[in-house]
Swiss-Prot record:
Biotechnology: Notoamides have been shown to exhibit antitumoral activities. Notoamides A-C show moderate cytotoxicity against HeLa and L1210 cells with IC(50) values in the range of 22-52 mg/ml, but the IC(50) value of notoamide D is greater than 100 mg/ml. Moreover, notoamide C induces G2/M-cell cycle arrest at a concentration of 6.3 mg/ml.
Free-text function comment from the UniProt entry: Part of the gene cluster that mediates the biosynthesis of notoamide, a fungal indole alkaloid that belongs to a family of natural products containing a characteristic bicyclo[2.2.2]diazaoctane core. The first step of notoamide biosynthesis involves coupling of L-proline and L-tryptophan by the bimodular NRPS notE, to produce cyclo-L-tryptophan-L-proline called brevianamide F.
Signal among keywords: yes
UniProt source species: Aspergillus sp. (strain MF297-2)
Signal is among the record's keywords: yes
Keywords of this entry: Glycoprotein, Signal
Stated name of the protein: Notoamide biosynthesis cluster protein J
InterPro entries: DUF4185, Glyco_hydro_beta-prop_sf
Length: 370
């Protein structure tokens, strides 16, 4: 059985024997969003999935991007496997009860939420190059109210080695936020599997979109920063690196690391008060945790890490931590989407056997303070 996401492989490597307390963690679970018993499962067949990356649709709604998705609770009984899919909600996460999904991309009313764009699904990636593609997973999304266009950054996965191996990161484009087309624009992984432009998070500020990227996991590496004019995102030559030349920092240079670490998927959002927030899984030890940082500018300096979510110590695996765009820097107004893999099989088996695990995976809303 295929796993639910790349992060399961990362966490299987570093968490299988961990028993971690939740002390010193700031964010607390508010509501489980995914399941057969939730709107996601009952209305759109999104009963087990992960990620739930939220991005602003600029129409009063937030789109949530999910990875490998099935319409059954238990992965070993998987039906209707597809990735990526999108659910939407205009409900503020601070309201009583938290987020409730109200619609799905690509379907009117109720019905099976379809995948958003082509996925090779253990086959050809569709580029005509004969590239093998195990699956496609979303990195982040962004929309532009001036044109109504949406762009999703995605990851083409070749295989789930340790660390797992992407073919490339790429962009998918939509004029309506419902159906997307993969573009030729892509950032190829290198032969050493160390390219630092594979996992993306994107945030617009004025005329620029700031793109933060890391390499595939689990491996130590840099976090890089680029920017691109918002209306030229599909043109790789328009991307400007933020780099150090030995004397000072500046744009239009080869990228230099703004941070180093064992990063899971990064999430960066500019909050309404101008604060920049960053959240990611710090996988540097046998007790990884979801942490946050803040800054006044995308270039930094970034604050020290603040622990938001620790593992629960009950055999489940928590990962993600994607920032809801309506979060603020005020107390208890940092809203995070956190994935939870719960296995019903032997978690002490090798990483290579993770694909044989049995269990379920869901996404919950956590609420904390930046």
């Amino acid at each position: 059985m295929r796993i639910m996401s790349i992060m399961l492989h990362l966490l299987a490597t570093i968490l299988l024997s961990s028993a971690v307390s939740a002390q010193n963690a700031n964010a607390a679970s508010t509501r489980r969003l995914i399941g057969e018993d939730r709107e996601s499962g009952r209305r759109w067949g999104v009963a087990a999935t992960d990620l739930g990356i939220p991005y602003d649709q600029h129409n009063g709604e937030i789109g949530f991007l999910f990875g490998d998705t099935v319409s059954t609770k238990w992965v070993q009984e998987a039906k209707d496997l597809r990735s990526p899919v999108m659910l939407r909600s205009g409900i503020h996460p601070g309201e009583d009860g938290g987020i409730v999904f109200e619609s799905a991309a690509g379907v009117d009313g109720d019905g099976l939420a379809p995948r958003l764009f082509y996925n090779g699904d253990r086959g050809d990636d569709g580029t005509g190059t004969g590239t093998w593609e195990f699956t496609v997973l979303p990195n982040d999304g962004i929309s532009f109210p001036e044109t109504g266009e949406h762009i999703i950054s995605y990851l083409s996965i070749m295989n789930f080695t340790t660390p797992w191996t992407p073919n490339y990161s790429g962009l998918a484009y939509s004029t309506d936020g419902n159906t997307f087309t993969r573009l030729p624009t892509k950032w190829l992984n290198n032969d050493n599997n160390t390219d630092p432009f594979q996992m993306w998070t994107m945030q617009r500020d004025g005329d620029w979109v700031y793109v933060f990227t890391v390499r595939s996991a689990p491996q130590y590496g840099p976090l890089m920063l680029q920017r691109v004019p918002w209306d030229k995102m599909t043109n790789k030559t328009e991307y400007q690196g933020w780099g150090w030349n030995g004397e000072d920092w500046g744009w239009q240079r080869p990228c230099s690391p703004i941070l180093d670490g064992y990063f899971g998927e990064p999430s960066v959002r500019r909050l309404h008060d101008g604060t920049w927030a960053m959240v990611y899984l710090n996988a540097s030890t046998s007790t990884p945790h979801i942490v946050s940082r803040s800054a006044k500018d995308p270039t930094g300096p970034w604050s020290e890490e603040k622990v938001q979510v620790n593992q629960e110590g009950d055999g489940s695996l928590l990962y993600g931590g994607f920032i809801h765009p309506w979060s603020t820097s005020k107390g208890n107004q940092l809203y995070l989407m956190v994935s939870n893999w719960t296995s019903t099989s032997n978690l002490s088996q090798t990483t290579e056997a993770v694909a044989d695990y049995e269990g379920t995976v869901s996404v919950s809303q956590f609420t904390g303070t930046l």
